[in-house]
């Protein structure tokens, strides 16, 4: 019998494991029963449970084919979730307690109500009912469960935007649909009007997941908007006028899992890039930003209009990727192996009037590792370089971002202590490590677990 210390449990207040062993076939002491007892107390609810597992019919010294234990951890057929209580009574290794029987009857009743048409209709009625909170700042959702559709309409607050060139009125809209085979389609649109320059911007993106098992997905997008030269830059640089240009773009993408663990993504896009040097801005806003930044915000960069056609391909592979097979989808689990990936981005010259001409490639590995009581870790190691730089525009540079002042960044994505943003053209080697201790340190201090503080650490290198 083993009980874990409370301060080592991020999700529970009590967790105990009891094990029974028996001398099987006069050959070996083996586990025959395992009981997990656990409970959790929070401000909102109290929960407790017991899970019993029985082991029997051992076959000792059995020889298995090398491919017998594959990456598929379990599989469920379509009728698995339709089994009644008689079936479970026949396969359950020990009888249920009276309290457990009552709980099952209660949950079965609740599930029957939740899955009934009348209940789903009532949920739709509540969701679709307009009220002042939805109208003013939350936004209005319209749900129709029989069709599997949802519409998300903007609130009054969300129609007000401030962007390059001043205040704008925008109308965002989202449509989402899922069918009985868990195939989905979503439409995300936004149209905005700028008062100072009397211009119209907007975007439309259509995404279709046509296969839920191999994650087969394609998308099409149209965009006219103000875009940052380096969208991943520090927030303090995002305030500068000199970081923006006007992008008129059309793009398409496709991705799917080819074999277990092997994913392929491909994207093509065409951009008609234009300078914002002639756009009007609010002088009072520029002055305010200059005081905050303690340096000139600069003007939008002036450049000759040009077109750019791109092709992107990424191949990623996770060896021995474990998964669960559900009736309509595949659930990917964390692997003990890292994910290896390769990216190639091509600036395609001449075709459709494109002016860019470059090749950039990147290789790397990434992984999320569960380390038991010590916590969880994430790391990324990558290297990249331009193989061809015949015509690389400012927007296409490979940037290393500066650290954010005041705010801390994710150590797995950037370098906190870097004092400036700069471009790299030669091969670089970059690594990041991020560790979340899950209370391994703070939970040992009385009352700290209830506060909800998190301890994290990380670091990186760039060569």
Identify the role of each PLM range:
Residues 1-70, 382:
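Gly/Pro-enriched, hydrophobic low-complexity segments
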Residues 76-463:
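Exposed, low-structure sequence patches enriched in small/polar residues
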């Amino acid at each position: 019998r083993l009980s874990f210390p409370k301060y080592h449990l991020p999700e529970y207040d009590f967790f105990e494991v009891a094990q029974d062993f028996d001398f099987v076939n006069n050959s070996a002491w083996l586990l025959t029963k395992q009981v997990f007892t656990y409970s959790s107390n929070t401000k909102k609810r109290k929960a407790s449970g017991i899970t019993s597992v029985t082991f029997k019919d051992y076959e000792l010294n059995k020889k298995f084919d090398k491919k017998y234990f594959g990456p598929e951890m379990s599989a469920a057929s379509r009728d698995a979730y339709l089994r009644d209580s008689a079936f479970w009574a026949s396969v359950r290794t020990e009888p249920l307690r009276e309290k457990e029987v009552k709980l099952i009857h209660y949950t079965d009743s609740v599930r029957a109500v939740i899955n009934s048409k009348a209940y789903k209709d009532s949920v739709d009625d509540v969701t679709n009912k307009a009220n002042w909170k939805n109208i003013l700042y939350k936004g209005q959702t319209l749900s129709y469960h029989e069709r599997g559709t949802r519409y998300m309409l903007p609130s009054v607050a969300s129609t007000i935007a401030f962007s390059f060139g001043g205040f704008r009125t925008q109308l965002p809209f989202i449509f989402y649909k899922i069918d009985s085979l868990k195939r989905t389609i979503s439409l995300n649109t936004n149209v905005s009007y700028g008062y100072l320059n009397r211009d119209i911007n907007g975007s439309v993106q259509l995404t279709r997941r046509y296969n839920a098992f191999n994650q087969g997905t394609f998308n099409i997008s149209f965009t006219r908007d103000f875009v940052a030269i380096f969208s991943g830059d520090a927030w303090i640089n995002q305030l500068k006028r000199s970081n923006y240009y006007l992008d008129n773009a059309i793009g398409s993408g496709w991705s799917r899992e080819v074999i277990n663990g092997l994913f392929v993504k491909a994207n093509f896009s065409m951009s008609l890039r234009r300078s914002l040097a002639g756009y009007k801005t609010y002088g009072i806003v520029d002055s305010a930003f200059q005081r905050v930044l303690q340096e000139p915000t600069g003007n939008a960069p002036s450049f000759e209009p040009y077109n750019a056609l791109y092709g992107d391909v990424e191949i990623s592979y996770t060896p021995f990727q474990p998964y669960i097979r559900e009736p309509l989808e595949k659930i990917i689990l964390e692997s003990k192996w890292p994910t290896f990936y390769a990216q190639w981005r091509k600036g395609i010259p001449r075709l459709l009037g494109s002016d860019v001409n470059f090749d950039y490639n990147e290789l790397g590995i990434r992984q999320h590792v569960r380390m038991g009581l010590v916590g969880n870790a994430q790391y990324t190691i990558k290297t990249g370089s331009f193989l061809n730089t015949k015509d690389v525009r400012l927007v296409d540079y490979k940037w290393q971002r500066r650290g954010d002042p005041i705010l801390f960044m994710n150590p797995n994505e950037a370098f906190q202590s870097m004092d400036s943003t700069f471009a790299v053209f030669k091969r670089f080697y970059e690594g990041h490590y991020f560790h979340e201790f899950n209370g391994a340190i703070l939970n040992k201090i009385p009352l700290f677990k209830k506060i909800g503080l998190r301890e994290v650490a990380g670091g990186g290198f760039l060569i």
